[in-house]
Each structure stands twice: as C-alpha cells, then as structure tokens.
C-alpha cells in the first residue's frame, strides 16, 4: 500500500471558513513558482461570526473519478464542489484546480460519466445537484473563478400535488444524455439533461410494495462495472430494492430485506451480473442477493462492526474485489473470486455465520473512519479515499480529508 497524494491538514479541525482559507493558502503556494493557475472562488456568505461555521467539520460526502482517471470530483459538507487533477507533478498535497460553492446544502449529485479535464466538449464536464427547496440544477465543473457559478440548466422537479420541489436523495446518469433522480414516496424521475421538463415521473404503487414502503425515500441507485441491459435498481430507506425499467417508466418492488437494519444506502453488482451486494445502515453485514433466483438472499458478508447513520461506501474492483472501510481506518476486502460467486463454494454450501473478509489493509490512524472508497476506472490499483472521525462526536481536532492510494 502506497499513499500517492492527500489533502494534508486542509480539512483538519472544525469550521467551514477555516478549511477554505487553508485550501486557498495551499493553492497560493502552488502559484509562486510561476504556474499559470486561476484563483479559487471563495465560499458564499461565510463569516467568522456565524457559530455554525465554526462548529461543523468539513467531511467529504461524495467522490467521483473522471472516466480516464485524470481528475476526481469531491462534494463536501461545506456546500463545495471541488475537482482535483491527478498527476505526478502536483506534489503530495492535493488542492483543487476548480471549486465552487452552493448557498444551500447539497443533498445529492451526479457527475457526467464523460467528464474529464481533457474533455474538449464542455457540455460533458458537468454535475447535476439537488438541494432542499430548490429545483435540480446542472452546473459546469470548469467555470470562471471571478464570477459566481451559474446553472446551465434548471429542471422542473416540483410535485404536481403540492407544487413543492422534490428533493432528490439519489441521482445517477443513465447514459450520456439522461439522468435519474430518486425522491420520497418511492418516486423516480427521468430527465433529459438538455430539457427542463422530466420525461417521466413514476413510483412503486402502494399495492405493489405495501402501505409503509410506499412512503419510502429512494436512497441510492445500483452501481455496476458492466451493464447487460437497460434495467436499473434502486434502494430505499425502508430496506427495499426497486426494479426500474426506464423505457416504460415501470417501477416495481423487487425485494424487501426484513432485518434490523434501517435502510439501504448502496447497491453493488458483481461483474457477471448474478449477485447484488446490499449495504445497509445500522447493520453488521452486507446482504448478498442472487438475481437468478428472484433476488433471494443467498449469503451474508459479515462486518466486524456495525454501521450507523454515517454511511461507509464501498467499491467493487475487478482486480481487488469488494472493498469497504471501517471505523478504525482499515479497508476490508473480499477477493474477486469470492465476490463473483456470492461467497458460495463449489459444493453450494454457505456458512450460517456468513463470510468474513479475506484481507485487511491499514490506511488511516486509529480514530479515523474510512467513509468512501472509489476505484480509478483507468488504473485498477489506485483508489480515492475519504476519511474522518465521527462527525457527530466531540473531538475538536476532527481530522478529515481525502487521499489517493495505490493498493
């Protein structure tokens, strides 16, 4: 394991304004040798006198690689969206080449799948975001630092019944031209990125999913290295897996996981498409579903800890298998040969106690949890990691950040 780059102490401590000023200082240091680089935009409306900006840590809540591995987009809890260049010349401390801030907290987002620092078509270097009481908006990732970021497109996300804007708790691009947004009451919308109005808005019926599940929040869309059809899946905070056919706007309840967990927050697929790996809040296991058996539960990957409200997002690498961080700064690994067969051996037997990890890598100091792991699509050995202590804790130092690692 080798650390390639990191954000240093930029996000250490508490205070949103403090983090942005340290980030600016690192950027200014890069400018001194004569690099022709622009200024970084300042946060909007931040003043040191506002107590909330002194108290809250700046934790990264989303990481997305560009398709060619040239850059990394990070969404932080200071309402900032940052893009980092990934190159050997940048040195060990990472500073964003672009950043902008939203006045409101970002609930969910999706980066265009063709985004790249070397992408000539600027219409592909975009991110769609959802904020509370706001319509969905599309922003450029490459903007003029001397001007506030302006939305390229605004989408009509208002509910026809209440006329209030639906907040999206999950967003994902379906292809290069369309994106999905998941909100409350099992509602999913499909948008053409170039048009204001949705193509369709649909939800799982009360008859199909039950009265309680009908009111559930769509929390995530499935993630896969390879897709074999147009069907997508979504998880809800009622621990239900939904099946979505974008061609017909059909949404149906596919599997309800009945355990003591409190909702699905991530769905990963094996490369062969046979197995789905379900990450849940307040759970000590990853549930394994078999798509060939109507999403029957066929196994459990046991975690040596219990997840809580702060989500720990994993990734699936063809080379390194399923990876997820824990609360002790370690990466737990299930090898590819285990993941591709659902942890089921040749005899078809499954241990009653579940499958434990096949490898552990120590990454961060004890007390820092690994919140997100994202593989580099252009280099199977490189991963981006977001780490922080418990953001709800009382630790004043609250050392958080991002690092790039070669496994």
Curated annotation (Swiss-Prot):
Q: What binding partners and quaternary form does the record give?
A: Associates with snRNPs.
- Known Gene3D superfamilies for this protein? YVTN repeat-like/Quinoprotein amine dehydrogenase
Q: Name the coiled-coil region(s).
A: none
What function is annotated for this protein? Involved in mRNA splicing. Helps to stabilize the U1 snRNP-5' splice site interaction.
Q: Which GO terms describe its biological process?
A: mRNA processing; RNA splicing
Task: Quote the subcellular location field of this record.
Answer: Nucleus
Origin organism is Eremothecium gossypii (strain ATCC 10895 / CBS 109.51 / FGSC 9923 / NRRL Y-1056) (Yeast)
Tell me the protein family, please: Belongs to the SWT21 family.
For this record, an example GO cellular component is:
nucleus
What is this protein's gene name?
SWT21
Keywords for this protein = mRNA processing, mRNA splicing, Nucleus
Name under which the protein is recorded: Protein SWT21
